[in-house]
Amino acid sequence: MDRRYFGTDGIRGRVGRTPMTPDFALRLGWAAGRVLAPRGNGLVIIGKDTRVSGYMFESALEAGLSAAGTDIRLLGPMPTPAVAYLTRTFRASAGIVISASHNPFYDNGFKFFSAQGTKLPDEVELAIEAELEKPIETVDSADIGKAERVVDAAGRYIEFCKSTIPNGTAFHDLKLVVDCAHGATYAVAPSVFEELGAEVVAIGAEPDGFNINEKAGSLHPENLRAAVLAQRADAGIALDGDGDRLVLVDEQGEVLDGDEALCIIALARAGEGALGGGVVGTQMSNLGLELALKAQGIAFERAAVGDRYVMEMLQQRGWLLGGESSGHILCLDRTSTGDGIVSALQVLAIMQATGRPLSELRKVMAKFPQTLLNVPLNGGVARDALLSAKAVKEAVRAAEGALGGEGRVLLRPSGTEPLMRVMVEGRERRQVEQIAREIAEAVRSVADHAG
């Protein structure tokens, strides 16, 4: 059965356009209540990021769930991984996050978590879509769901985050700059690090409903770099709007992406005998990560892009650690989903345990130069036809020949936007950039003619 609304990371779109409308949110809440409540205790947790539209969608979801006879706990602005955690601790049937992650304020979305704090299985998402096609029928008045606000949600999550590093680990000698992207972590992230003893300089922590991710957070580390250098900080931590991504900056102002953070954590876990198997990356993971892990005898597998697929492969293998270069890191020995704060804590704890600065820890991996270009596509272009077009296949074949087995070429359509992503990596940056431009031009030419 084809999906109509759910993508690789829930439902997402421009506010005011289907499906991101109040009436859709009302129907979604009702449909979700009908499907999810019978699978557990009839309770659903709702959290959101700091977008102004979140309040509108929260009310609509609440009404729909209540009409289906489902009780609700409202967390208010709270990171996505906090919703996953609190869904588990409340023994709820499901959790819903109102967020569009790293997108601008005018987008929003709905992410769902199972009772275990993981993404919903495909069959459950399809069941919700099937219910969406039915007219809303409100339960009897005596059975209408009740909504309550959870006033101590932030404190519960802060304590959980602190519990993910060894007892006795403290950051009293660390000065940190934390960029909250004017998003859902603005209140909790600085508190986590401060309570562990660090001196914290918070930036991107003044949300107004419209500035989420605006020149801030993990997609815009330039402000964090400048602040780390100006403050002479030991490290910088950049989170995205909903708090599930992490980008780091070392004390010299150099940016570390998710691959580098994942490598640091993996090698430290392996050294402790606590890795629990291999590591899962994605098709976009840097070749340097794979080589660094394999040099230490650590198995490495690539999943499709998206933390959902990393999670699926980890579960299939029975492994505990995986992630994406974008900064989604899954530490399943600590939590059930990607968590930027928890991932940052793991790296900082390694810094403290080894006495090595971040600029030294990052040397465990030598990154290959990598270029990623996004080619906009018009609505009439079939993705499969584009990938199989003769001109595109010839450009890829020529690129692979030029790289000579010391690099990779990857073309993949975006799961959330009308884009074709062109990724090229190899040993020489100029060559990589030139090859990426040539392939992107071939894709653009075929797409334009198809439109």
UniProtKB/Swiss-Prot annotation:
Magnesium: present as a keyword of the record? yes
Coiled-coil region list: none
One GO BP annotation of this record: peptidoglycan biosynthetic process
Q: What class of enzyme is it?
A: isomerase
- Per the UniProt record, which EC number(s) apply here? 5.4.2.10
One of the entry's Gene Ontology molecular-function terms is: phosphoglucosamine mutase activity
The active site is formed by 101
Q: What InterPro entries does this protein map onto?
A: A-D-PHexomutase_a/b/a-I, A-D-PHexomutase_a/b/a-I/II/III, A-D-PHexomutase_a/b/a-II, A-D-PHexomutase_a/b/a-III, A-D-PHexomutase_C, A-D-PHexomutase_C_sf, A-D-PHexomutase_CS, Alpha-D-phosphohexomutase_SF
Cofactor(s) recorded for this entry are: Mg(2+)
Report which reactions are catalysed by this protein. Answer: alpha-D-glucosamine 1-phosphate = D-glucosamine 6-phosphate
Phosphoserine modification sites?
101
What post-translational modification does the entry describe? Activated by phosphorylation.
Tell me which GO cellular component terms the UniProt record holds. cytosol
Record keywords = Isomerase, Magnesium, Metal-binding, Phosphoprotein
| Membrane-spanning ranges | none
Write down how the cofactor binds this protein. Binds 1 Mg(2+) ion per subunit.
For the ligand (Mg(2+)), the binding residues are 101, 240, 242, 244
Record function comment: Catalyzes the conversion of glucosamine-6-phosphate to glucosamine-1-phosphate.
- Return the similarity comment: Belongs to the phosphohexose mutase family.
Xref: NCBIfam families: glmM, PRK10887.1
**HAMAP family, per database record:** GlmM_B (MF_01554_B)
What's the protein called, per UniProt? Phosphoglucosamine mutase
Please give the organism.
Thioalkalivibrio sulfidiphilus (strain HL-EbGR7)
Q: What is the lineage of its organism?
A: Bacteria, Pseudomonadati, Pseudomonadota, Gammaproteobacteria, Chromatiales
Please name the gene that encodes this protein: glmM
